[in-house]
Amino acid sequence: MSISQAGLGLAGVVSRVLALALEAAGPVAGEDLREGPTLVVIGATGIVGLGGDLGSVAERVRADLPRSEVLIVSDAVTAAVGALDGHPGAMVAAGTGSVGLGTDMATSWRVVDGWGHLLGDLGGGAWIGRQAMRAVVEAVDGRRMDPVRLREALTAELGEVDSWAAQLYTSDERAGILARAARPVAQLALEGDDLSAAICREAGRELARTLCAAAFPGASRRVTWTGGVVSEGGVTAQALRAEVLRRLPGAEVTRAVGDPLDGAFCLAERIGPRALQSLQERRLGAWFPMPTAAPEPRGLDSVSL
């Protein structure tokens, strides 16, 4: 569920998801979580760059879990920790948007891109969709040859070309609309469509630039990627791998081990005080310890959202 779709704000979305999680846990486990010390880890899109009152999010959590400690981090952090299984290295995540993160999992966290579809997110789904849609409208204007297969695929997905501007400029979900166009582009690229393949290869190169910029000496040569845009065997992933190995000849390219949910669990289990401090200093997260009036915890259960 996206925050804008829910119309609730981050605190409202967290409250709803937490209620569903407690319901799924069942009455016994849910009561244990309410009564016992609990660490809640929340990974959310855009919380750092877009600001917002994260304290109100922690308050919402404590309305249901009064003896909880709350860690709110960028989803780039949970994605990287999950993909790298808690080990040092660098990752690029490419879904609707794109972001790279390199870390030693202690005091250093380097974020690259993640600027959103208007300023960045190069190589992500919205970027791919925009390149494809732009090629089609240029053909409509007579500025290039008509990419027949691409135009047919995009109109099947999004409707007639003359409706695209209204769809995009009247919606709060522009990035999602653009990213919908990326799906047929990826399929056509696999089928040998020249323009679609060229767009996907350029996306892979852009993602490689992001990943290599996120990697830094002293962390690890381990690199990986995650997200639907870079699914294994696709043209984008192939171009990404080739460009990474060209730019970082000694890189240790590995498959992503886990997803952002795995990253949240890993943070709940392993994160230490130095990492907490560095995340806050880099404005990648916010830590809300247990209220001082609460008894000292003897152990922590974890709930990851």
Where do the language-model regions lie?
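Phosphate-binding/catalytic loop of phosphoryl-transfer enzymes
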Residues: 44-147, 291-304
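ATP-binding/phosphotransfer module of carbohydrate and carboxylate kinases, centering on a glycine-rich
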Residues: 1-38, 62, 82-90, 133-305
